[in-house]
């Protein structure tokens, strides 16, 4: 996992000798951490998914701006697509969400990029995608799976989402069904009917990404919805 590799990089950087990490995650956050540590004096080299770290005695003071949260940005892009919104996102390298941009364009969103800005306009009708599959970067991130499921519920036809990263990542489905979603789970695949008319309901979030998916669904539902356990949401969204 990316977070595990990040911890290993920080630990190994101060150890003596050479450490080689193989089959590493290559998410932008990993490369951003590499940039920060290198600025501080670390000796880190990459070759594909292999990271070689030569230990150093000490690290120097440095200044570094942490990159934007691509999952948060992707969530807002989904929100704009879902609500026929008109959104501008600043201070984000569009290249880190290229795959997400391509998918949202397929469903009908109009998206333009300029420097570190993204402009997105939601479509009048959301087109279904027959097989969305979560993958490691640069594929569709598992952390956007729940949000995309809400989007597909509002599409004009049938679609499916395959979760290939984590087990038991469909805990939000039962709550979406409370709102009226027609979703059938077959192992790690969700079959989604589309054309859903969400009706407000009391909902319970089970984790960070599920909670924001429920909020998105509630936004486009008829009537009042109450989402419980919002402390999950507060871990990843301001």
Predicted features by range, described:
Residues 1-11:
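Single conserved hydrophobic/aromatic residue that forms the stacking wall/gate
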Residues 12-22, 28-32:
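Internal alpha/beta core interface subdomains
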Residues 13-14, 36, 41-70, 81-82, ...:
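Self-splicing inteins and homing endonuclease
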Residues 23, 55, 91, 122, ...:
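Residues on the solvent-exposed faces and adjacent turns
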Residues 71-73, 206-214:
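Conserved phosphate/oxyanion-binding catalytic-loop motifs
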Residues 125, 227-238:
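Structural signal for terminal/edge beta-strands and the immediately following C-terminal loop/tail
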Residues 139-192:
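C-terminal structural cap/anchor segments
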